[in-house]
């Protein structure tokens, strides 16, 4: 018989830096999950990813307090900021441009995010990432 799902917990945790402090501790503590077990498993799984990069994770908690989790790719905005070499996006994206990214960088980000995005092809996903870049105040160059 399949285990009964008790809850889904969605978090963004820095790669390789999961610890029992907020937001991980309170979110999993409410569900009765062994927090240290999750932290060790998450840190082991994200070992190959650049430390500190925020990784979305969906944790499935079962009624017997066991859990499984799925990691996703980092948010497009984080990858764009990293590619442009900026700390944050523009407060007025249509007026103040804060950086530049090339179309090749945008395509590379789209290919990285392909597993998580619901686009029909890489071109559609690239256009979606370009829109995110523009809304952050980045200029997309050829």
Curated annotation (Swiss-Prot):
The keyword rRNA-binding is assigned to this record: yes
Q: Which domain of life is it from?
A: Bacteria
PTM annotation: One or more lysine residues are methylated.
- What's one GO BP annotation on this UniProt entry? translation
One GO cellular component assignment for this chain's record is: cytosolic large ribosomal subunit
Gene3D superfamilies recorded for this chain?
Ribosomal protein L11, C-terminal domain (1.10.10.250), Ribosomal protein L11/L12, N-terminal domain (3.30.1550.10)
Return one GO MF term: structural constituent of ribosome
UniProt keyword annotations, A-Z: Methylation, Ribonucleoprotein, Ribosomal protein, RNA-binding, rRNA-binding
One Pfam family name is: Ribosomal_L11_N
Q: Which family does it belong to?
A: Belongs to the universal ribosomal protein uL11 family.
Q: What does this protein do?
A: Forms part of the ribosomal stalk which helps the ribosome interact with GTP-bound translation factors.
Relate the assembly described in the record.
Answer: Part of the ribosomal stalk of the 50S ribosomal subunit. Interacts with L10 and the large rRNA to form the base of the stalk. L10 forms an elongated spine to which L12 dimers bind in a sequential fashion forming a multimeric L10(L12)X complex.
Q: Which PANTHER family match?
A: 60S RIBOSOMAL PROTEIN L12, LARGE RIBOSOMAL SUBUNIT PROTEIN UL11M
Designated name of the protein? Large ribosomal subunit protein uL11
- This chain's source organism reads Serratia marcescens
């Amino acid at each position: 018989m399949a285990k009964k799902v008790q809850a889904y917990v969605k978090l963004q945790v820095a790669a390789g830096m999961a610890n029992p402090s907020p937001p991980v501790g309170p979110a999993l503590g409410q569900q009765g999950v062994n927090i240290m077990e999750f932290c060790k498993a998450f840190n082991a799984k994200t070992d190959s990813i650049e430390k500190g990069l925020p990784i979305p994770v969906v944790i499935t908690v079962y009624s017997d307090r066991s859990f499984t989790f799925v990691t996703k790719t980092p948010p497009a905005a984080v990858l764009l900021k990293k590619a442009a070499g900026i700390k944050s996006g523009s407060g007025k994206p249509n007026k103040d441009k804060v950086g530049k990214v090339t179309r090749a960088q945008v395509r590379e980000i789209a290919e990285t995010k392909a597993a998580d995005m619901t686009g029909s092809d890489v071109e559609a996903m690239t256009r979606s990432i370009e829109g995110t870049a523009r809304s952050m105040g980045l200029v997309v160059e050829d």
